[in-house]
Amino acid sequence: MTIKASGGSSLARPQLYQTVPLSNISQAEQQDRYLESGELTALKTFYDSGLKRLAIAQAIKLSSQLIVSRAANRIFAGGSPLAYLDQPETDTDDSDLGVSMAVGDASGATGIFGGVKNLFLGSGGGKIPAGFRPISVSRYGPRNMTKSLRDMAWFLRYTTYAIVAGDPSILVVNTRGLKEVIENACSIPATIVAIQEMKAASLDLFRGDREAQETVVQYFDVLITEMQTQVPNDKLRQRPSIDAQGLQLPQSYFNAAEKRQKFVMKPGLSALEKNSVVKAAYRQIFERDITRAYSQSISYLESQVKSGDISMKEFVRRLAKSPLYRKQFFEPFINSRALELAFRHILGRGPSSREEVQEYFAIVSSGGLAALVDALVDSQEYADYFGEETVPYLRGLGQEAQECRNWGMQQDLFKYSAPFRKVPQFITTFASYNQPLPDQHVYGSGNDALEIQFGAIFPKATRSPSASPAPFNKDTRRILIHRGPGINNQLGNPRARATQPGSLGAKVFRLNNELPSGKTTNVSFSESATQKVIEAAYRQVFGRMVYAGQRQKVAEIKLENGEITLREFIRALAKSDVFRNTYWSSLYVTKAVEYIHRRLLGRPTYGRQEINSYFDTCAKKGFYALVDAIIDSKEYEEAFGEDTVPYERYLTPGGYSLRQTRPGALREDVGVKVKVEKTARFIELGTSSTKNLPVTDVDARLKQGVNIQRQQTKAFKLTDTFNKVELKTAIAAAYRQIFERDIEPYIVDAQFTALESKLGNREINMKEFIEGLGCSELYQKEFYTPYPNTKVIEMGTKHFLGRAPLDQQEIRKYNQILASQGLKAFIGAMVNSMEYLDNFGEDTVPFRRFPTLPAANFPNTERLYNQLTKQNRDLVVPSFEPAVKR
């Protein structure tokens, strides 16, 4: 087993401290029950006193400098401790909290100066511990003075945190064990005196408010007690195994973690308490309370364990051997997965090593479920942790130290969804430790974005989850493919880092405003070249062109004027709010570092050593320092210099394969070269073909060259006006034919209600309805007034005859009518023509007829119908050829 193994990158959020709501609700959740009256009362008291506790914390916060100063004056001598106190950051208006600050009104002080006077002239906070002596400021040193005052401010701030949380857990976790640390740097008696003085100063703020003073005393006393407590011993993991990792958990982590109740079966327990212990055993073995959820139980075993005939250890053994357990957790799984679930149920953990899996796999393979259960229950580990009376429990994060080699799988095993995963996780992960390193990010495959141009797209861990380990050590370097000649790889040939990739790599943009001759400068050439470089910079940094409002106009102007270099322009883009919000604020730090590194430096990160340095920069200095570290690096200077837009220099093997056609992943009938079978010429000549025969059918001649739209054309014919659905359909078709769009109801109500009523009452037919639409004000406004007569004639024949004008003779005919008699006479001439009656009759809505004779009219009709309404004013059938401009 390698010592560099890592069991995946499963995310864990350890609990940092306890609160009243969390403590009460977690106990009820562990026992799968509703909150009891005592827990509800505790929650009610917590929320009722919430405003009071917030007011206390706010009052202490406002006077924190005075309180710390008073404590410092008490333990330091020979100087001014206030000079070493860091000024707190100015907060926004405190009234935003909505907390009334009416505290300390009953004191004898008047105004703020009275409060300051009470703070500095108040009495001590308690009995002075033995060994206390004031500390000389000059001998203590400025550095130690600053640290001591900072620590006192921390103690005061953590006290306010505990007051707001309603639980002293945060004080216990953060101060227990500090005694030895403080003794090495300062003095425990002096620290106790300082805390007592801060306690007394805080009490002076609440004179006359007994409840507030009791709250302050409670939490300061806890702080003083914990400061005097010896450093607790770490919790060691108990396992007499030669292949297990030696692990220990700091006591502070255990104190901060969720409290997991231990259920112990004692002979003197009441019947109700024994029932709760039995239910806890059901929840551990079957992962649910089977008596409550499914009305199932093993009654004879329950009676035996309650009466003391068998111990809890035997009860667990028989539950795990029961037919119910076999049916749910053994038969549906293969042996390796059943072994993992049995470890969770009986020992409260997952398998620890490959050797352990092999040992118990041999047992379950030879003896079945019964032998596996006996081996686990009779093990020394079970006896050390649970003994004869304790119900097994999950030994997860916070209960004891966790191993790194099975970290991800164990976190998944503790989830409620574990029985739904059929594939074994532990044995496959342990086996992968001896395999070559995978082609993935060193901190998990989910941190590698898809290597595409647009955006940062990362694979989701919730879809096809994989906790496969990636045991990369700090010296491991990822395999990267150079986009360019292989001889210019920067690892094998560092001097070729500045060499451009040529045709084998990405296109390179350089900012150079001078012409190759170097004698003259073309202004327009310079401006266009600069704009191209700016666009390339946006595409490289953001992966796309940003919106006009997101462009960095000031930086662009400076670059065009030569005030900044292209390198500084790239820095300005990377530090913009748009880039920060898109690729920093919305991503986890590791993902953000990886993506920003690819955008600014043109390659993925190499390994843990490089990422850790960037991570340290982000943690200590923030986002802008990360951008500066990348752009100011020697690699950036050598690869791009001051005048080159960063480009993609390296790819991962996964990204390279993503951009390639992968024939191996395609079906046999896809991606295969098509072989054309050639037919012998004498066979072609001897085969009869209809294409060589003369076409004598007139209908076939008429239909040649006409697309499928002719068969798909639907003619709307109004035959029954009493059918309201048919009437509305025909009217809507008429609107679309004449106006080339649907007409809004308010326009219909204003202009066409009378026409529709007459059509519905059979006072007019469809032909007269069409003529009325053409003579309306709306048609005149849209198709007559804005256009010349020739264009009006084209649109009129399209709307009322379903074709383009036949020839110039027809255009002259309608032009005379239109010029002498107006629009209504023009429309009447078309609607009352014999052509209209032959094609549409009295009751059919006009439609496109696809006329093929004369031959010149068919392409004109195609152009007229394929041209959108009001798209342009060009004539489809011009009266003369346009003159060519010279």
From Swiss-Prot:
Q: Its GO biological process terms?
A: photosynthesis
Tell me the residue numbers annotated for binding (2R,3E)-phycocyanobilin: 186
Q: What is the lineage of its organism?
A: Bacteria, Bacillati, Cyanobacteriota, Cyanophyceae, Oscillatoriophycideae
Quaternary context: Heterodimer with ApcF (a variant beta-allophycocyanin). Phycobilisomes of this organism are composed of a two cylinder core, from which six rods radiate. The core is mainly composed of allophycocyanin alpha and beta chains and of minor components.
PTM description: Contains one covalently linked bilin chromophore. This protein autochromophorylates.
* EC numbers for this chain: 4.-.-.-
How does the record classify its membrane topology? Peripheral membrane protein
Gene3D superfamilies per the UniProt record, alphabetical? Phycobilisome linker domain, Phycocyanins
Q: Which UniProt keywords apply?
A: Antenna complex, Bile pigment, Chromophore, Electron transport, Lyase, Membrane, Photosynthesis, Phycobilisome, Repeat, Thylakoid, Transport
Q: Which SUPFAM superfamilies match?
A: Globin-like
Q: Which residues form the PBS-linker domain?
A: 243-422, 499-675, 696-873
Give a yes or no for keyword DNA-binding in this entry.
no
Q: Which family does it belong to?
A: Belongs to the phycobilisome linker protein family.
| Leading EC class | lyase
Q: What does this protein do?
A: This protein is postulated to act both as terminal energy acceptor (by its phycobilin-like domains) and as a linker polypeptide (by its repeats and arms) that stabilizes the phycobilisome core architecture. Has intrinsic bilin lyase activity.
What InterPro entries does the annotation carry? Globin-like_sf (IPR009050), PBS_linker_dom (IPR001297), PBS_linker_sf (IPR038255), Phycobilisome_asu/bsu (IPR012128), Phycobilisome_asu/bsu_sf (IPR038719)
Q: Name one GO cellular component term.
A: phycobilisome
Q: What is this protein called?
A: Phycobiliprotein ApcE
Q: In terms of one coarse class, where is the protein primarily found?
A: membrane
Compartment annotation: Cellular thylakoid membrane
Q: In the record, what terms sit under GO molecular function? A: lyase activity
